[in-house]
A protein has these predicted regions:
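Short, flexible, mixed-charge acidic loops at enzyme active sites
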Residues: 96-107
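Metallocofactor- and cofactor-centric catalytic cores in central/energy metabolism, strongly enriched
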Residues: 2-97, 111-114, 118-150
Length: 150
């Protein structure tokens, strides 16, 4: 029998989370994820709640033995994790708006993944990713970290 897997998704309130879950559900026999923990920050709690409810319905419809959890406590979620995914946006959509508008106001490409906007996003995101990695090293050092964050 294959080991059941625990996946922790940092930025679990993202609109990309249902697509990630869909992949786990479709490939359950090859990748037996039994726990999916959705983690977000307080500012993202409303979106986290919406995505959590959608994910529970998806699991029920699929009939797969996978439990979805949600929390704002990253360290709690990381206990015994096998995989940690990141798909976060530090500063929420307001920060993305600034990443795009500030360069545009100076005649440059307004984009969140490259150019000045990408630099702004990177400067906000890299310290948070390091904090996450430090927690992974301390709490679940054998977990694989998969970064989906731009």
């Amino acid at each position: 029998m294959q080991k059941k897997l625990k996946v922790v998704t940092i930025g679990g309130g993202s609109s990309y989370t249902p697509e990630l879950l869909e992949g786990f559900l479709k490939r359950y026999h090859e990748l037996p994820v039994s726990e999916l923990w959705l983690v977000d920050v307080e500012e993202g709690q409303e979106k986290l709640n919406i995505i959590f409810e959608l994910c529970k319905r998806m699991v029920a419809k699929a009939g797969v033995p996978l439990t979805v959890h949600k929390t704002l406590d990253r360290r709690l979620a990381l206990q015994d994790a096998d995989f940690v995914t990141t798909q976060l946006r530090v500063g929420q959509l307001k920060a993305r708006e600034m990443d795009e508008r500030i360069p545009l106001s100076h005649g440059y490409l307004g984009q969140e993944t490259n150019g000045a906007g990408g630099l702004f996003k990177g400067l906000r995101t890299i310290p948070v990713i390091f904090d996450i990695i430090n927690d992974v090293e301390a709490i679940c050092p054998n977990a694989w970290v998969i970064n989906f964050t731009n």
